[in-house]
């Protein structure tokens, strides 16, 4: 399944983007949701939690459930937005607040403005960072083949944006960009990624085969 994901991402989201695939991933999935990148002492990063409305300054009771409303990057305004449809809009709906906002309409639920969630920072990133992912494929398990690598940590290049949270600059990545980097798809950023399907890099067809 991982190799299938690698091929689909490479061929239909990077090499030859398919409008149907792109629209589907951009609207009714969590691929555009922003994730905080947590710095490590060695200069690398790990994926932290999702960015929430409360990180943008929204507070209860003026904002209902701000800790449960996820954030995307809006292509139209070129800044973060609180897209409707996350769990924070499901509970405690009230007239004049969140009533009728638990849906996938492309609207910022807090401002009422139209938005277009951005899938990737690949073409307009503030930086490209090294992100560490755990690798478990080298461990021996009964009934399953293993494929040891040089390390149990995979380092991948990820394009990121920058936001301010409590007066601090933080790097954020979309779930889409994190997933693509995790799969080892070469998107022109360098680093440890597969140049072809024949490379023994997690998670290519050669690696899985």
Question: What is each PLM-predicted segment?
Answer:
Residues 1-208:
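Long, well-ordered, tryptophan-enriched scaffold segments
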